[in-house]
Amino acid sequence: MIQKSFVMMKPDAVQRRLMGKILSRFEEKGLQIVAVKLMQIDEDLAKTHYGEHADKPFFGSLIEYITSSPSLAMVIEGEEAISTIRKLVGATNPLEADLGTIRGDFAMDTGRNIIHASDSPDSAEREINLFFNEDEICDYEIVDNKLIYE
């Protein structure tokens, strides 16, 4: 099933100039970037996005971190995109993430774990709608899809 997922490279990925390397992992897998924007996330958007963590002790530092520098927000589409992206991203704790995953290769600390990816279709829809307007999401076909998908 073709799905859309929300993915965000966090400030540490941007500051460490890892955006190109990370983006290429999704494209090389056969996923399609259908929306992307570099943005400075303000406190209100950060609190809305991470609202499920509002009662956790790390919430304040998470908001401070995510608003500290630009992030790269994306919508990525593909067959079973949500689970595929989660596998590419790796475990939330980079020290538990397998080598070869984005977090396993580029991150060392849970508080600076490089990237966010939607964990369910409901989360993906909510997060996409939070960060993108409908007219910012492109609908196009990649010519090599017939080489990737049967």
From Swiss-Prot:
ATP binds at K10, F58, R86, T92, R103, N113. PROSITE patterns: NDPK, NDPK_LIKE. GO terms for cellular component: cytoplasm. It is an enzyme of class 2 (transferase). Its cofactor is Mg(2+). It is found in: Cytoplasm. Pfam families: NDK (PF00334). Major role in the synthesis of nucleoside triphosphates other than ATP. The ATP gamma phosphate is transferred to the NDP beta phosphate via a ping-pong mechanism, using a phosphorylated active-site intermediate. This is Nucleoside diphosphate kinase. It comes from Methanobrevibacter smithii (strain ATCC 35061 / DSM 861 / OCM 144 / PS).
